[in-house]
Amino acid sequence: MEAVDALLSRVSAPRLTGAVPASLLADMVQAAQRAPDHAQLAPYRFLVVTGEGSSALGELMVAARLAAAPDTDAATLDKLRLKPLRAPMIIVGIASPTPHPKVPEIEQLLTAGIALQ
């Protein structure tokens, strides 16, 4: 019942500080790779963002916001720009289904969702 206990006691950490040990990150990726995947397509990708990448992500978020809502005020843009800097690491999950004759896109999206969770 250890797995059930782990799921039932899981909570999100509101603020993270310090670097994430490489071994923990490797364990997380290895666990994600155990998601059900009928044809071993691995229809997901992980992008680890740290350091300068966090600043670049903030700028990208601002650019996307301005493209969608050009009238966004400066204070909101500044807050958005700084958001990725609140954590020492961001793991971006990307669903990337590929055409397959036996595995429909919806199944690949479900696999990605399980892996990313």
Give residue ranges: language-model regions.
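N-terminal amphipathic, basic helical "cap/leader" segment at the start of enzyme domains
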Residues: 1-87
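Short beta-strand element of the conserved SAM-dependent methyltransferase core
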Residues: 16, 93-94
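Small-aliphatic-rich amphipathic alpha-helix that forms the alpha element of a beta-alpha
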Residues: 32, 91, 97-117
